[in-house]
Amino acid sequence: TLFARNAERLEAAVKQLSGEGHAIAVADFTLPEDVTQAVASVVAHGPVDILINNTGGPPGGPAHAADTEAYLAAFTQHLMCNQRLVQAVLPGMRAAGGGRIVNVISTSVKQPLDGLGVSNTVRGAVANWAKTLANELGPDGITVNNVLPGATRTARLDQIAETKAAKTGQTPTEVLHAMAQAVPLRRLGEAEEVGGAIAFLCSPAAAYISGINLPVDGGRTRSL
């Protein structure tokens, strides 16, 4: 089941998927009650074995300049809605004797990114929430892990490049090139590569992996 706020985009995404049985659920993650109602309709049709949390990032800017409302909005969209989704799918996972929860966050949980103050803050909170869940849910056979994408070719990265270009006088293409050169592999990541890491953590091969932060960043993060 694909879960997002835009029904047309969800339907278009389903058409690109192979196989049958794909469904959509529509909810606005700025409205937690929307999320609760939508996920209830999903679990009513059967248990959820795998939950992937992947919410778009908040607007950029320095941490000290952000309004408190921006922090509250980010925590609502990320942590609060993630919590509601977990609470909704947990009974089915426990009844099945296990499950997988994967949160797509950011390498900023290991190394804060300049100009993304609110995002850095909320991503760190989600990472600690997930680690806590891994400890709590392990006895139920449920693994909880985080995937940390680096500079990956997405609309979000284009947005960040355009914002930085407007401030520095560079072109967005020049900004993206500089980002790629800062990666040891000297290129940007692809969404499919992040998807591969998620698929691995949801596979039987990762049954004994829980509570980790897995960077998918071409080696850019400097910490161990």
Labelled PLM ranges:
Residues 111, 198-199, 210-224:
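Short C-terminal tail/terminal secondary-structure segment
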Residues 1-12:
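Conserved glycine-rich Rossmann-like NAD(P)H-binding loop of the short-chain dehydrogenase/reductase
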